[in-house]
């Protein structure tokens, strides 16, 4: 039955170029040269989290004032950093190496209001994935899931967690981790992200493109080439369509796609626009260029 669903989904043609989001202009902002990459955009669109080109450290950049605040120097902190739904807490990683030169990853939470910092996952070689839903962090380590509250009064909810293990898409639900991989285990997966309402997951299949399906693996929808996909809302995804020569990216656009197969380029050909970060509550999307430039696009549904 699953194979039939996959075949049917792959046969659905993309609806083509159509307006997915209304665009209201694009603004270039000046960020510190040492942290030119946007790691995350606050939900309310008031600040960016910036990191170095190799994802070391995190800096909070206030968009209104242009002021910066160093949050951490931790190696790897900018890779996969997560913001809580209220924008007051972050979860970031810290890479370290043992005596055998093997990498271990720890997770820390930081309250951006009071500065309180806490290690929520000790250094491990088996960290498979983590996510933030509301004010809780879900951590999958060695196929076991733990939920950490990031704020007092948090009511913990066990939503599905997705991670990549040996190029396969894994799901952890009810304390059990299993292979999910809706398009088959002969494929390689990357970039999974749960939808805001926790009913769908977007992911990318290497060499094929991005897909969305329900968290039970049904209703697979192809989205085309949309790399590093992020949910803008429960029915819209933003990502990048980049082109390279094997060494360098020479073209890239920020794309918006919906679950009906409509797609729209949000950036001009003159920019190499990469790795979008949406702030849906503020109707904004940020992105970076390989040259260290940062832009913010104003959008609306």
What does each model-identified segment do?
Residues 1-20:
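Bacterial Sec-dependent N-terminal signal peptides
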Residues 19-301:
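Sequence signature of WD/YWTD-type beta-propeller architectures
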């Amino acid at each position: 039955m699953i194979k039939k669903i996959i075949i049917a989904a792959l046969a659905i043609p993309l609806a083509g170029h159509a307006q997915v989001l209304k665009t209201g202009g694009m603004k270039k902002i000046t960020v510190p040269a040492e942290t030119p990459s946007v790691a995350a955009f606050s939900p309310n669109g008031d600040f960016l989290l910036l990191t170095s080109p190799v994802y070391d450290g995190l800096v909070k950049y206030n968009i209104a004032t242009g002021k910066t605040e160093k949050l951490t120097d931790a190696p790897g902190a900018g890779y996969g950093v997560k913001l809580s739904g209220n924008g007051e807490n972050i979860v970031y990683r810290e890479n370290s190496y043992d005596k055998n030169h093997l990498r271990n990853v720890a997770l820390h939470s930081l309250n951006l209001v009071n500065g309180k910092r806490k290690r929520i996952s000790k250094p491990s070689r088996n960290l498979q994935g983590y996510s933030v839903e509301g004010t809780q962090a879900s951590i999958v380590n060695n196929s076991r899931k733990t939920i950490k509250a990031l704020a007092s009064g948090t009511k913990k909810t066990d939503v599905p967690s997705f991670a990549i293990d040996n190029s396969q898409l894994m799901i952890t639900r009810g304390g059990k981790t299993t292979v999910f991989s809706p398009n088959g285990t002969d494929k390689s997966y990357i970039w999974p992200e749960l939808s805001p309402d926790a009913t769908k997951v977007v992911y990318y299949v290497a060499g094929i493109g991005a897909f969305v399906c329900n968290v039970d693996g049904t209703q697979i929808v192809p989205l085309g080439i949309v790399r590093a996909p992020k949910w803008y809302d429960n029915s819209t995804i933003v990502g990048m369509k980049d082109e390279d020569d094997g060494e360098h990216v020479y073209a890239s656009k920020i794309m918006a796609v919906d679950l009906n197969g409509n797609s729209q380029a949000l950036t001009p050909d003159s920019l190499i626009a990469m790795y979008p970060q949406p702030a849906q509550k503020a109707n904004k999307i940020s992105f970076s260029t390989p040259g260290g430039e940062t832009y913010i696009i104003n959008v609306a549904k």
